[in-house]
Amino acid sequence: MLVPIPALNDNYIWLYGRENLPVIAIDVAECKNLSAYLTQHHLQLEAVLLTHYHDDHTGGVEELKRYYPDIPVYGPAETADKGATHIVNEGNIQTAHYRIEVVPSGGHTANHVSYLIDNHLFCGDTLFSAGCGRVFTGDYGQMFESITRLKQLPDKTVICPAHEYTLSNLVFAEAFAPNEKVKSAVKNQRISVESLRAQNKPSLPTTLALEKNINPFLQAENLADFIYLRKAKDNF
């Protein structure tokens, strides 16, 4: 089971679980929608994963813990005061039913992490469909290194970003496409996403294979090109 639960303006709280097992929640932006979904579908919550400290990824944790006082909450050091009970930065987490790989992915924030469960990557604000996160408390070199690390995952990896930014990202990617082949691929994806969003359907998840064809930040060959694109997107 893989479910993006809409939250706030454009966030997704991701739920992941195998059949008939408790589920994992990633980046609890708010409690209300998450707890309602869990109750409606009679789901048990096994753990919470936080990618970074920003309030739109952690704002629901404390309220959620009122309903699940013993729930383990994993996150990087920067989430220690946001409800995290277990601090992680790399390596593996073993819950009752899941083995979770912690992937360092700083840049958006200095200690940002992503989580790989089976072949699903929950990457917070590091990698978006057709885009990547802004650089705040991290730096450009760190972000480029993180994007490059994620790019090495298998093409079949399912990418689960925390925001519905796809359409605006595709508009940028089309404008900055390096050649007609890429521009055509981006345009086709934009048309597809426009249809989904018109029906109020999520554009996510995506796959690494698709992102390699449409995401300008995955196509950046060096740090200088990456910085150029990131600054251009900041002002687009």
UniProtKB/Swiss-Prot annotation:
It catalyses: an S-(2-hydroxyacyl)glutathione + H2O = a 2-hydroxy carboxylate + glutathione + H(+). Keywords: Hydrolase, Metal-binding, Zinc. Binds 2 Zn(2+) ions per subunit. One of its GO terms (molecular function) is metal ion binding. Zn(2+) 1 binds at residues 52, 54, 108, 125. One of its GO terms (biological process) is methylglyoxal catabolic process to D-lactate via S-lactoyl-glutathione. It is an enzyme of class 3 (hydrolase). Its cofactor is Zn(2+). Pfam families: HAGH_C (PF16123), Lactamase_B (PF00753). Pathway: Secondary metabolite metabolism; methylglyoxal degradation; (R)-lactate from methylglyoxal: step 2/2. It comes from the Bacteria. Zn(2+) 2 binds at residues 56-57, 125, 163. Signal peptide: none annotated. Its EC number is 3.1.2.6. Monomer. Thiolesterase that catalyzes the hydrolysis of S-D-lactoyl-glutathione to form glutathione and D-lactic acid. Belongs to the metallo-beta-lactamase superfamily. Glyoxalase II family. This is Hydroxyacylglutathione hydrolase. The gene is gloB.
